[in-house]
């Protein structure tokens, strides 16, 4: 099954996540089909906290991709910010 989920990056104590489209059987930070955005939970000031390529996310959801629980929350947040 194809999922949209977070892949962790950054360094120790400074997490940074990429929103990736991947096969659910692949490792968390392993091979992916496409990166569709990023999430920086410790962004402050003028730094961008969340960036989502809404067009590509809509495409993958129409193809049957399932977002993880956290990604579903982030997509709602991004849609709310865009409106």
Curated annotation (Swiss-Prot):
Keywords, sorted A to Z: Ribonucleoprotein, Ribosomal protein
One Pfam family named in its UniProt record: Ribosomal_S16
SUPFAM superfamilies: Ribosomal protein S16
Superkingdom of this protein's organism: Bacteria
One cellular component (GO) term of this entry: small ribosomal subunit
A GO molecular-function descriptor: structural constituent of ribosome
Signal peptide: none
InterPro entries: Ribosomal_bS16 (IPR000307), Ribosomal_bS16_dom_sf (IPR023803)
Gene3D superfamilies linked: 3.30.1320.10
Gene Ontology process terms (BP): translation
NCBIfam families: S16
Protein family: Belongs to the bacterial ribosomal protein bS16 family.
Protein's UniProt name: Small ribosomal subunit protein bS16
Organism: Pseudomonas entomophila (strain L48)
Encoding gene (name): rpsP
């Amino acid at each position: 099954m194809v999922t949209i989920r977070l892949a962790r990056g950054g360094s120790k104590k400074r997490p940074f996540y990429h929103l990736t489209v991947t096969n659910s059987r692949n490792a968390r930070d392993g091979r992916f089909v496409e990166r569709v955005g990023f999430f920086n939970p410790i962004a402050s000031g003028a730094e961008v906290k969340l960036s989502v390529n809404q067009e590509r996310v809509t495409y993958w959801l129409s193809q049957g991709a399932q977002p993880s629980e956290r990604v579903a929350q982030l997509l709602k947040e991004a849609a709310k910010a865009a409106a």
